[in-house]
Amino acid sequence: MPAATWTASPSPPNWPVPMPRRPPMPRSVKRDRWIALGLLLLVMGVAYLVLVHPWFTQPMLAVQDDLQSLRERELRVRVQLQQAPQVSQRLQQARQTLQSRPGFLPESSAELASAGLVQRLERAVVDASPGNRSCAISNRSPLQPETKRFTRVAVQVRLRCGTPELASVLYSLENGTPRLFVDNLNVMAQRYQLSPNESGNGLDIAFELAGYLRPGSNAGPVNTGAAPAAGEASNAP
């Protein structure tokens, strides 16, 4: 009797088991999520503006600006220190040039400068007319100094001169050293007597004789009392 044979039945194929589908998310839930995300971002922004920015970010920015300004200042100081020898040399040269320039009066104060102007005037008149035969100072009085960029010192002058003598006096004053300036010149023709034994036609001249003090000089007030030249008051009208 033949032996019985057993054959296994074929196993069914392993097919993937389908997952159950989730139901679609309602639109209201999506909208709520976006609203919640927006509110979260808004809260974070407000918290940054209220808590972080004024207490941390803003002070750090201020410190950064201060550091930048300090770096720039340090750089300028270093450059100035490097240029200090050249600046000192140029300053010394400028001072020497200022001392040698004839444009400023040598006196250190307005009072002394006014006296120096009067002496210059008297020398110019004596050179133009020795013995005051044809030119004389009838009056000269210092004016108050004018302090602007440079201190102007002036003397109000009145002369009695002939025409050639006046030209000589003005030339001597304006072309000497230090340089002087003749301002507000007023010339009038007038018959006058230069000496008891002589008479003729001459000029009555009024002007301001001015000069400038060096920077840093004392520009204090001066005595402005009029003082006719000694020995010449008799020539005044």
From Swiss-Prot:
User: Which residues does UniProt assign to the signal peptide?
Assistant: none
User: Which superkingdom is the protein from?
Assistant: Bacteria
Q: Where is the composition biased (Pro residues)?
A: 10-21
* Name of the featured protein: Protein XpsM
> Taxonomic classification, please?
Bacteria, Pseudomonadati, Pseudomonadota, Gammaproteobacteria, Lysobacterales
Q: Where is this region: Disordered?
A: 1-21
In which organism is this protein found? Answer: Xanthomonas campestris pv. campestris (strain ATCC 33913 / DSM 3586 / NCPPB 528 / LMG 568 / P 25)
